[in-house]
Amino acid sequence: MTPVIQTEIAFKPCDLLNTRYEGWLADRLEINVEKRLLKLDLDMILEPFVNRPGKQWWAGEHVGKYLHAATHAWRFTQDERLASDMKSVVKRLIDTQLSNGYLGTYKESDQFRQGDGLNWDGPVWDVWTHKYNLIGLLSYYKTMRYEP
């Protein structure tokens, strides 16, 4: 059945790879790349994965957030330094994945369970880290056509 009233599509996504930014927005994008993404201590955000549970067992989402932001920034800038950093982070992150597929920061006794091993009996947010890892890795994969 055809609707009585035809709706018009109000939103059409733009082609971000072929969009050129100028002025204030272009300046902000460049500052974000130069002053944040290229300056971020990548060893620090990978440390909780390399040395589970790390200094802060709850701080694992930053790698995924970095990859998501850096991938989108790269789409605008095509900055090869950023591409190189992202490639390194992806490889290093994937290298920390356990044989059972686990890609988080918690020690084995706390993975997807209650408690944190430090006398805390409440829920742990292990899924939080995985969520952001997947968002970041999928953003990277889609844009950079990553093949393991």
Which residue ranges define each predicted feature?
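Glycan-recognition and catalytic cores of secretory/periplasmic carbohydrate-active enzymes
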Residues: 1-148
